[in-house]
From Swiss-Prot:
WD repeats lie at residues 11-53, 68-107, 127-166, 170-209, 218-263, 264-319, 323-364. Keywords: Chromatin regulator, Nucleus, Phosphoprotein, Repeat, Repressor, Transcription, Transcription regulation, WD repeat. SUPFAM superfamilies: WD40 repeat-like. The lineage of its organism: Eukaryota, Metazoa, Ecdysozoa, Arthropoda, Hexapoda. This is Protein HIRA homolog. Required for the periodic repression of histone gene transcription during the cell cycle. Required for replication-independent chromatin assembly. Promotes remodeling of sperm chromatin following fertilization via the incorporation of histone H3.3 and histone H4. Belongs to the WD repeat HIR1 family. It comes from Drosophila melanogaster. InterPro entries: CAF1B_HIR1_beta-prop, G-protein_beta_WD-40_rep, HIR1-like, HIRA-like_C, HIRA_B_motif, WD40/YVTN_repeat-like_dom_sf, WD40_repeat_dom_sf, WD40_rpt. PROSITE patterns: WD_REPEATS_1, WD_REPEATS_2, WD_REPEATS_REGION. The modification Phosphoserine is found at S519. CDD domains: WD40.
């Protein structure tokens, strides 16, 4: 083994937080702090390994330096294919780098410093609200996982950057590490909340939470990088505790048992990294036995030491103390070489070069896939939801229902099935301690395949067996006895003696892990699906609020929420008083602390925006706080139960909350009134706890569930609207209709954002094939778009409404008929329907539809026809849209004892504006007079009546403000119709239209007698009303009259 520390690898004496070796072992990347920025550097690996290349001036050492990050880079990771490099930083961004042709200058040097390779940022991923601490590419580069101090893990679609597939919320502390299961079935994340969460990648639900090994841990590490073994059998965590001493916890895939760990480091373990491949080595005893196969991993700690472990050894292969001057933060293995690199906060890296005799040789990818197939029945590269779920134990399909699987024993001699697999050899050391040596079961062609792992679990002298064969062997059905020549494990003393092992700290006297932790027995016949916690207990949060925290009245927990420049730090159980525990909330911005707030009950949920902070407690109380001053905006509100989600509308004018018992409330903050009060208990009973919750600017709630269903509430229908379902219609409808800039249009497209984020689109991508004819697909897509239009009208989402009208136009132009197209266009030319569609600007949509239809040459005739109709409609509506007659009204008998027929003009027309400005005019000898003022007017028609002033004459001045009433009836004035198009505008100044002649307000009107006029009773002959040829126009003084009868 050679230990190399190249001094020329540095970040100008700044910290290096991450290192990763490229798949071809020709280069490696480092990430850390630069000069007032975050820095990513790609280095040539050859000068590190070769002294000749190091001193050759023609061999470049630094290949490329990228300083585009605004803050320190915490993690760099190469993709599996080596084409992409991902970097995560304190600036909340993730950048995806790709190599481009030519060379470039180092950013910020003015071209003085040249890069030998050109790497450019092709994608910038935005979604985290805090520092990004760790990254991990999935097998086959399907996804990229990132974790942050905002307590979330985001799954990015690596095939469609910058789209995200899911946001995993469940941690209540800073998430400091993520790792993919090599089979693609699970994703593990480790957090400061003293837990590891296992997520199911098939539906991104929480599968299991592991807390026991971390109960004594503190948040003393910058990162917590955990790692899966290459065979998928074991997950090794970072910082754990055993008997007061730091350990690296071993978690078995079978039942998630946690009874074994690596011990010996004096301070917290910060990072763990398995070699990417299963290693093999021929035994050195000269026997012709098959090669020994095992896994290898490295462990780094805050005690500045590095240890390398092999599953075929009872002790660490090598331990190097004081390798750096500060904590070790990252580790990486060379996939093609026996190479290990580590980096430290002190700004340096170290490289350990092993020989194949020392470390072993990596088996080929085909051999590793064969091992995976034998253990799981499927090649792991097809996992991650791209096909059927990985079957953990395919032999179970062969078992009759009700039968229990039997063990398939193996022996280490030619006598078949003489001893059970758990047989071990036990010896005594000189000091009286027991040494238990497990029997090694090598890989062979005829029997089940496994990797034996012997791991130090307490002190340096005693070992505990961890055999992956127990999972596979324990589930095989009974079969004919098979002879196998198992080779007992050899300690490989000659190999170990060549290397200075060093000594782990022997002062740690810990009890065996089996005594410390009691794991539930795992039934091999029980599916792993049964080990999940109930869905109703998984309080996953929405995209708009942190998750509902699992806290108790006396429990302690901390979490941070950030938005823009503001940051809220919550500490439950901060202070203990004689009346109970107090929770503390601290608000700060980028410069200073703003305020402190104490709550008498633990906080289980909170959210914040630019103006306000929402605090929800365990006792069901809710507090709305001003972010600037910390003063309450609302008094404390009591809810029926604690809040699961809370969210602000995008414009910060509304705030909503959803409780555990299904209570939904939305408040208007400025008016301090409730905007919506509803219940969704029936939805919770049907789908479980809500996973997403948000509020639109129009006050519409959007609720999403882990099942893929999402809903919104309609106050007019008093019902829940179905926004999304997880079926083929939804998948095919959304497919191909997402805008290219969807990530920037989430606030303008609330419906589509909810549908895309509820896993209806991404969970089907690549896993569902449409094998049937296209006829149903075309019909289904058109009907889906039509339903989307109705949903947009209900949500009052105008931008989305225009988008779906374009989509429907394109589909009808491509697959529709002329009859169907005409029905669609005629509807847009019609007047808006009362109720939910009043806000729809139909003429604007019509223009948009015609623009979309114009490129289709086969529809030119229809386009020209409806273009002319649109022009005529605009012209007519400009004249009539604000003078729409009121619905026919019935009245009591007039003084003449008769009433006019429905729909006929009878007496006079009175026009008002907002109840304040009005101009009254009489219709003389059947002539019609309409008055238009400002931007909207209304016209009412009364029955036969007499108009008189209240004892004084009226004068006309300015635009005039008057009110008129009938002596025989009183009619309600309908609300004005909204403007449907920018082209339809009222005139800037008031105008009076008399017999189709338009006069401006400044024009001189014909002289009118302003004295009171007696109007003769209406005549019913011929159905027409007759009046005296005189009229009065009221001026600034209102005209009042006595009412004798009212309808």
């Amino acid at each position: 083994m050679r230990l190399l520390k190249p001094a020329w690898v540095h970040h100008d004496d700044k910290q290096i937080f991450s290192v990763d070796i490229h798949k071809d072992c020709t280069k490696f990347a480092t990430g850390g702090q630069g000069s007032d920025c975050g820095r990513v550097v790609i280095w040539n690996l050859l000068p590190v390994l070769s002294d000749k290349a190091e001193f050759d001036a023609d061999v470049p050492k630094m290949l490329c330096q990228m300083d585009q990050h605004l803050a320190c880079v915490n993690c760099v990771r190469w993709s599996q294919n080596g084409q992409n490099l991902a970097s995560g930083s304190d600036d909340k961004l993730i950048m995806i780098w790709r190599k481009s042709a030519g060379s470039s200058g180092v950013f910020g040097t003015g071209g003085m410093q040249k890069n030998h390779e050109s790497w450019k940022c092709f994608y910038t991923l935005r979604g985290h609200d805090g520092d990004v601490l760790d990254l991990a590419w999935s097998p086959n580069d399907v996804y990229l996982a990132s974790c942050s101090i905002d307590n979330t893990v985001i799954i990015w679609d690596a095939q469609a950057f910058p789209h995200s597939v899911a946001t995993l919320k469940g941690h209540t502390g800073l998430v400091k590490g993520v790792s993919w299961d090599p089979l693609g079935r699970f994703l593990a994340s480790q957090s400061d909340d003293r837990s590891i969460k296992i997520w199911n990648t098939m539906n991104w639900s929480l599968s299991h939470t592991i807390t026991e090994p971390f109960e004594e841990c503190g948040g003393t590490t910058h990162i917590l990088r955990l790692s899966w073994s290459p065979d998928g059998q074991y997950l090794v965590s970072a910082h754990a505790m055993n008997g007061g001493g730091p350990t690296a916890q071993i978690i078995e895939r079978e039942g998630w048992k946690c009874d074994k760990d690596f011990v010996g480091h004096r301070k917290a373990v910060t990072c763990v990294r398995f070699h990417n491949s299963i290693l093999s080595r021929q035994e050195n005893d000269g026997s012709p036995s098959k090669p020994l196969q095992y896994c290898c991993l490295a462990v780094g700690s805050r005690d500045r030491s590095l240890s390398v472990w092999m599953t075929a050894l009872q002790r660490p292969m090598v331990v190097i103390h004081e390798l750096f001057n500060a904590s070790i933060l990252d580790l990486t293995w060379g996939p093609q070489e026996c190479l290990l690199m580590a980096c430290s906060v002190d700004g340096s890296i170290a490289c350990l070069k092993f020989t194949e005799e020392e470390l072993g040789k990596a088996i080929s990818e085909e051999e590793q896939n064969a091992i995976i197939r034998k253990m799981y029945g499927k090649n792991y590269v097809n996992g991650l939801g791209k096909s059927a779920p990985v079957l953990e134990h395919p032999q179970r399909l062969l078992l009759p229902q009700g039968d229990k699987p039997t063990k398939f024993p193996l022996s280490n001699n030619n006598e078949a099935n003489q001893r059970p697999i758990s047989k071990q050899t036990e010896t005594r050391t000189k000091d009286g301690k027991r040494r238990i040596t497990p029997m090694f079961i090598p890989l062979h062609e005829d029997g089940p395949t496994s990797l034996s792992m012997n791991i130090v679990s307490s002190s340096g002298s005693s070992t505990t067996a961890l055999t992956s064969c127990s999972a596979a062997i324990g589930t095989l059905p009974a079969a004919a006895p098979t002879e196998s020549a198992a080779t007992p494990l050899m300690p490989l003393e000659p190999l170990v003696s060549k290397i200075d092992l060093g000594r782990l700290d022997s002062r740690l006297k810990t009890q065996p892990a089996s005594q410390r932790r009691q794991s539930l027995p795992f039934d091999p016949g029980q599916s792993n699906e049964l080990l999940r916690t109930p869905r109703l207990e998984e309080h996953q949060s929405s995209t708009c609020s942190p998750s509902n925290l699992n806290v108790t009245a006396t429990g302690k927990s901390e979490f941070v929420k950030a938005a823009l420049d503001y940051r809220l730090h919550v500490s439950n159980g901060h202070l203990k008083t004689q009346h109970g525990m107090l929770a503390k909330v601290t608000a700060s911005d980028s410069k200073e602390m703003l305020w402190e707030f104490y709550v008498g009950s633990p906080l289980v949920n909170l959210n914040l925006c630019e103006k306000y902070a929402m605090l929800c407690s365990l006792d069901g109380s809710m507090r709305l706080i001003s972010m600037e001053t910390g003063c309450p905006v609302f008094p404390a509100i009591s809810l029926t139960s604690s809040a699961v989600h809370c969210a602000f509308s995008p414009d910060n004018s509304l705030v909503g909350v959803l409780t555990e018992c299904g209570l939904l409330r939305i408040w208007d903050i400025a008016k301090k009134v409730v905007s919506l009060a509803a219940g969704c208990l029936e939805l919770l009973n049907k789908h479980g706890t809500a996973a997403q919750f948000s509020v639109t600017n129009q006050g519409m709630p959007l609720i999403g569930f882990p099942s893929g269903n999402s809903y919104s509430y309609s106050t007019s229908l008093q019902s829940w609207l179905v926004l999304a379902t997880k079926d083929a219609i939804m998948y095919h409808g959304i497919r191909g209709t997402l805008p290219r800039d969807m990530d920037q249009m989430q606030q303008k497209f609330p419906l589509l954002s909810m549908q895309a984020s509820s896993q209806n689109y991404f969970s089907f991508t690549g896993s569902m094939e449409l094998r049937h004819s296209e006829s149903w697909q075309q019909c289904a897509k058109i009907r889906f778009i039509e339903n989307q239009i109705k949903l947009c009208e209900a949500l009052q989402s105008l931008d989305e409404l225009q988008h779906w009208h374009k989509m429907l136009t394109f589909q009808l132009a491509t697959h529709g008929s002329e009859k169907r197209m005409r029905v669609f266009l005629d509807d847009l030319l019609s007047m808006p329907e009362p109720g939910i569609s009043q806000f729809v600007p139909k003429l604007e949509l019509m223009q948009c539809v015609l623009d979309t239809l114009k490129p289709h040459s086969e529809w030119n005739r229809l386009h020209s026809e409806y273009t002319e109709l649109l022009k005529e409609c605009k012209s007519e509506r400009q004249k009539d849209i604000f003078a729409t007659p009121a619905p026919p009204q019935q009245k009591t008998a007039s003084s003449a004892g008769s009433s006019p027929r429905s729909g006929e003009a009878t007496g006079e027309e009175v026009t008002e504006k907002d109840g304040a400005t009005a101009v009254a005019a009489a219709v003389v000898a059947g002539s019609r007079m309409a008055v238009t003022t400002g931007t909207s007017t209304t016209t009412t028609t009364t029955a036969s009546s007499s108009l008189s002033s209240s004892g004084s004459s009226s004068s006309t001045s300015g635009s005039g403000s008057s009110s008129s009433s009938s002596s025989t009836s009183s009619l309600s004035v309908p609300q004005p119709a909204p403007s449907l198009s920018p082209e339809i505008q009222t005139l800037d100044s008031p105008t009076v239209c008399i017999d189709d002649e338009i006069l401006s307000a400044s024009s001189s009107l014909p002289p009118l007698d302003t004295s009171p006029v007696e109007v003769s009773p209406a005549s019913t002959s011929g159905g027409a009303a007759s009046t005296s040829p005189a009229a009065s126009v009221a001026g600034s003084a209102p005209v009042s009259s006595s009412k004798t009868d009212q309808t």
